[in-house]
């Protein structure tokens, strides 16, 4: 079925018809994970270009994908680093697509939603959610020097 409008899917399990991709370019390597860096979002950027070009993205709701997660990725330090780099990636994509102010406003809105959600959760879960949002914001609002 078509992927819901207004959302961009993740790229963990995707397939394309090569002929249908002409004119959209490939994945932007500056947004990919290279040399241990956790910058990401090349698939989000690519999906965004497809949607802007009028393409429909399809998905299989019942598909199952298994992840093997090494212990090093289950630490608080990794979680903070990953969350920070999610913010950096969001900023890079917002700069590419010239929507940085809109992305900043959206992040502030997400803070409001996060605080409301935290009021409904056990304190331990709330702390993890707040850590994630804080690190994403730090990455998003920090200008990266090239």
Located regions from the model:
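Non-catalytic, C-terminal membrane-associated alpha-helical segments of glycosyltransferases
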Residues: 81-88, 95-146
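Nucleotide-sugar-dependent glycosyltransferase catalytic core
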Residues: 33-39, 66-89, 95
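A short, conserved alpha-helix in the catalytic core of glycosyltransferases
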Residues: 11-25, 30-63
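Short, flexible, basic/aromatic active-site loop/helix in glycosyltransferases
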Residues: 1-7, 11
């Amino acid at each position: 079925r078509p992927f819901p409008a207004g959302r961009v899917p993740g790229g963990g399990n995707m397939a394309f018809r090569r002929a249908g991709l002409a004119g959209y370019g490939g994945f932007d390597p500056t947004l990919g994970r290279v040399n241990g860096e956790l910058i990401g979002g090349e698939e989000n950027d690519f999906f965004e270009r497809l949607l802007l070009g009028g393409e429909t993205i399809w998905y299989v709701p019942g598909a199952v994908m298994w992840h093997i997660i090494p212990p090093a990725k289950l630490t608080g330090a990794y979680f903070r680093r990953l969350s920070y780099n999610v913010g950096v990636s969001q900023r890079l994509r917002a700069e590419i697509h010239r929507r940085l102010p809109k992305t900043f406003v959206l992040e502030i809105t997400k803070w409001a939603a996060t605080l409301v959600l935290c009021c409904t959760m056990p304190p331990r879960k709330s702390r993890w959610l707040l850590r994630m949002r804080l690190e994403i914001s730090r990455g998003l609002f920090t200008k990266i020097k090239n």
